[in-house]
Amino acid sequence: MENLKTYTFDEAYKASLNYFAGDELAARVWVNKYAMKDSYGNIYECSPEDMHHRLANEIARIEKKYENPMSAEEIFELLDHFRYIIPAGSPMTGIGNDHQVASLSNCFVIGIDGDGDSYGAIMRLDEEQVQLMKRRGGVGHDLSQIRPKGTPVNNSALTSTGLVPFMERYSNSTREVAQDGRRGALMLSVSIKHPDSEAFIDAKMTEGKVTGANVSVKIDDEFMEAAVADKPYTQKFPIDSSNPLVEKQISAKKLWGKIVHNAWKSAEPGVLFWDTIIRESIPDCYADLGFKTVSTNPCGEIPLCPYDSCRLLSVNLYSYVENPFTKEAKFNFELFKKHVAKAQRIMDDIIDLELEKIDLIMSKIENDPQCDDIKHAEYHLWEKIKSKSSKGRRTGVGITAEGDMIAAMGLRYGTQEATDFSVDVHRTLALAAYRSSVEMAKERGAFEIFSAEREANNPFILRMKEADPQLYEDMLKYGRRNIACLTIAPTGTTSLMTQTTSGIEPVFMPVYKRRRKVNPNDADVHVDFVDEVGDSFEEYIVYHKKFLEWMRVNGIDTEKRYTQEEIDALVAQSPYYKATANDVDWLMKVRKQGAIQKWVDHSISVTVNLPNDVDEALVNKLYVEAWRSGCKGCTIYRDGSRSGVMIAVSKKDKKKADKEKEGATDMPVKPLHNVVEVRPKELECDVVRFQNNKEKWVAFVGLLDGYPYEIFTGLQDDEEGIALPKTVTKGKIIKQIEPDGKRRYDFQFENKRGYKTTVEGLSEKFNPEYWNYAKLISGVLRYRMPIDHVIKLVSSLQLKDQSINTWKNGVERALKKYVVDGTEAKGQVCPVCGHETLVYQEGCLICKNCGASRCG
């Protein structure tokens, strides 16, 4: 590899800040997530312009293999400044990046052909899930093949444990896999026909359970009809068997009520209207050839068959509005159609680039030093993925900035007029993408198993035939390059760089406040807030970029420091008024999703945001309307139903808040615990494992009333360390007094058979220096210092020895899981967006501003 120029973070950030016209958040996101880097963190690109040249050159290299190639310059113009076409994160990071051996695919689904109801099959999926996640992919798989709890099995267990233990296994595997500083993404699904579906639905209601996965229930029309009409419904296993091993009748209405309640309470499970998905699915016309859809990717926008994958790309809808925010605003449909055709072509090129990446992955596996027995499973996994990718050539062309497009056209998101316009745009997109796929079939050949006869009665194809008969005739004649083409995904950090609304969603808030820490002694500093430790903060207004554009177009001063009342008045004048995520008419949003879904061959990822005070009846109404409207899935989020998420504040709460103590924030209530001077003889204990300079360590956290009271740490699996089975996660710490009066602490746990095992003398297992620091930390825990303050104290310890610093980090990780969800991480800055908006959630730090997460 040639010696490439490298840049410091500051150099890349400064150049990117200039590129994004001063948008600090966009600049930080790009440098941290998308600039080309090697495994040592060296940065090889100075700004997104470098990245777009890298992408354009690689895509143009593939174009040269085919007729009528696009040039690198033409492709660059489409990508530049994220104006028209934006590949998703994995393609942006991986294309042309020889420093990483990773897939370009955003998402995968895995599964077992035939009988998946065996430990071997379950373990195989666990291994495959991990292997994909380490290459950056999100993974989905279905658990409907696992036999229900209590059914006979031919092993020493005698009866099956059911689905839930395996949900926890797959969830834990996800949490263990690091993908560039974040956890992997996992979707677990199950059919409502399965006798264990109720246990699946309830699994995440237990705090701390299945925290590494999204869960969705595959619901058929028969169940929905039974739930609405309050009729019985039959569950069975195997779910599609005419001669099932297990069969039982349930109240569909009662189980549906549980789905609604859990979604209202915790935003999960999501619902997948499976009959609609299968009925509309073009790939399922080839189900007998391996394209039977079994689950979805983690966000739900791509239903997939086992070992298929998808790469995503978005078209920036705002960029096609001419004279935005004026009476002359017009959508340029002709330019849009041309660009969608090129976007579909670029997506097909990216499939070829992905096949090259898969070859590199397989070559690396072959050359890895491990024995062939170990490497075989991973190698075979990529063989299967390569086969499906080349056979179907599936793409995921989508959109972003729908909310801004609607506002720029002078329409209000959530109205019938705006929905009708959006449907026109998505119909145009679908026809242009399919036209492009047919044209490529002429030039490059159709996907390997194309059959017009198989697809003849597919509802999506029939809609295309009615809308554009000539396109349909050409498809019969030439075929199609791609088995399926379209999706609408959540665009997340990508929309931060387009500086637009995300995906199909409305704007979250057009104007909001942020705080930055300031030195009160500096000149011209305005202190708006002082926290409990005395740090000073200045509040400043952040405008959504396109709202700022509306202000400019209408001659409104964008530099003035406005009062809250003035800001409210400005928003009321704008097309964003009553069109935010929390304002839009919920039923209209669901109906809009259903109307647009008719022109999207995969699915749509969209969330219906609800205020905290809505009841379960509304959630029920929205879900039923989603089913009737033709949605393939539906997700709701009730404000405050999950901790660690940005909470919206209503105006009626504002007056009440203003009267309260200055600086008070809407924080979770921290539990108050009495100080217990005399340690009980026995304490419940959690076991937490971590790495310390490549050594395996274990922490024992003694708990009093469920709250950390003391901590012990030591080496694990060492002759001088602590021998402990990996399955042990809980036990007791027992205080003993020896004959000479010395105190000793023992750890006791129960093995799988219920027998107690005691590890004596925890304190003897420690390096004296570690032991002294552990005693210090235990002291502040004993006197009930809040856990987040203890973590801050531990992190502030100035230790010279690298090994003990690493140990200190492990102690922090062990304690984070006890911080109350939603607690703010005072004084800590998000490494992605640079703002002090981090909160603790399930032991991880989550940024309320940009959604970045950091565990450990």
Residues covered by each model-derived region:
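Short cysteine-rich clusters marking metal-coordination/redox-active sites
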Residues: 830-833, 847-850
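Function-dense linear segments that define catalytic or interfacial modules
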Residues: 36, 58-65, 78-155, 163-166, ...
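Catalytic alpha/beta core of large soluble enzyme barrels
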Residues: 24, 300-302, 354, 461, ...
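Short, Gly/Pro- and small/polar-rich lid/capping loops
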Residues: 472-474, 650-701
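Internal maturation/activation junctions in enzymes
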Residues: 75-76, 236-238, 339-386, 390, ...
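Terminal amphipathic helices with adjacent charged low-complexity linkers/tails
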Residues: 219, 280, 285-290, 297, ...
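Cys/His-rich microdomains that often coordinate metals
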Residues: 836-838, 853-854
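Conserved, charged catalytic cores of large soluble enzymes
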Residues: 2-69, 73, 155-169, 179-291, ...
